[in-house]
Amino acid sequence: MIGRLRGIVLEKQPPLVLLETNGVGYEVHMPMTCFYELPDAGQEAVLFTHFVVREDAQLLYGFNDKQERALFRELIKVNGVGPKLALAILSGMSAQQFVSAIEREAIVSLVKLPGVGKKTAERLVVEMKDRFKGLNGDLFNQSSDINLPATAKQTTSDADSEAEAAAALVSLGYKPQEASRMVSKIAKPGADCETLIREALRAVL
């Protein structure tokens, strides 16, 4: 199992990052809350990974620390929650925000996440609440505010950034029309793709 990768960021296409390690490029799926913290292309990054083998694909999911990965692994143990839905959940909420929502039994907040209906939200609360006792460390000390790296630069047109952001939201489980509408509502001149995704996800919660 591939549990950790250290390498150079080659490409960032939310929610995917291409990381080169020893001449091999690894395509890694990341929750947007983790993706925001990646360095720019050409810089080194370290990711803690979870490897999934399916009949039709082998997939890597990446996280900034072990606590985030541990939360992802607990999520996919919940009945009806697979890696794709877990990724969407942790893209819409930071680890700390999700833990808080579960502890407060905030069903109303959880159902705003893509792919999470009332029954799934209730199941998450029931199955996850007691599991957090075994998860400790930075997971409970992270700020709920998500800040983009100061080095992030605008390199594409506004239209390209908006299209990229909408495509990323679709990959997280939102319907195309819904994703476009979410981006349109918060679009600002000069905003890059990552900023648009972050603001669109914040707006629905």
From Swiss-Prot:
Key words, A-Z: Cytoplasm, DNA damage, DNA recombination, DNA repair, DNA-binding
Alphabetical list of InterPro entries matching this protein: DNA_helicase_Holl-junc_RuvA_I (IPR013849), Hlx-hairpin-Hlx_DNA-bd_motif (IPR003583), NA-bd_OB-fold (IPR012340), RuvA (IPR000085), RuvA_2-like (IPR010994), RuvA_C (IPR011114), RuvA_C_sf (IPR036267)
Keyword DNA-binding: yes
Name of a matching Pfam family: HHH_5
UniProt region (Domain II), positions on chain: 65-143
Record function comment: The RuvA-RuvB-RuvC complex processes Holliday junction (HJ) DNA during genetic recombination and DNA repair, while the RuvA-RuvB complex plays an important role in the rescue of blocked DNA replication forks via replication fork reversal (RFR). RuvA specifically binds to HJ cruciform DNA, conferring on it an open structure. The RuvB hexamer acts as an ATP-dependent pump, pulling dsDNA into and through the RuvAB complex. HJ branch migration allows RuvC to scan DNA until it finds its consensus sequence, where it cleaves and resolves the cruciform DNA.
Matches recorded under HAMAP family: DNA_HJ_migration_RuvA
Name assigned to this protein: Holliday junction branch migration complex subunit RuvA
Phylogenetic placement of the source organism: Bacteria, Pseudomonadati, Pseudomonadota, Gammaproteobacteria, Enterobacterales
The gene coding this protein: ruvA
